[in-house]
């Protein structure tokens, strides 16, 4: 599944927690999390603070 497809699945509520965390780790690693709507950057930082994902 491409990042775009996974983002659409996320926005449609179709991803479970593990898939959501994997998506946000991928978005952070690629830098895309900071270029999308503010929600993505804020959610990424929440996941970092909670220890679910790491900054590259």
Predicted segments, located by residue:
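Catalytic phosphate/metal-binding cores of nucleic-acid and nucleotide-processing enzymes, i.e., regions
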Residues: 1-56
């Amino acid at each position: 599944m491409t990042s775009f497809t996974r983002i659409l699945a996320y926005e449609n509520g179709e991803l479970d927690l593990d898939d959501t965390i994997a998506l946000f780790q991928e978005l952070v690693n690629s830098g895309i999390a900071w270029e999308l709507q503010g929600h993505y950057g804020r959610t990424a930082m929440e996941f970092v603070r909670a220890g679910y994902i790491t900054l590259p």
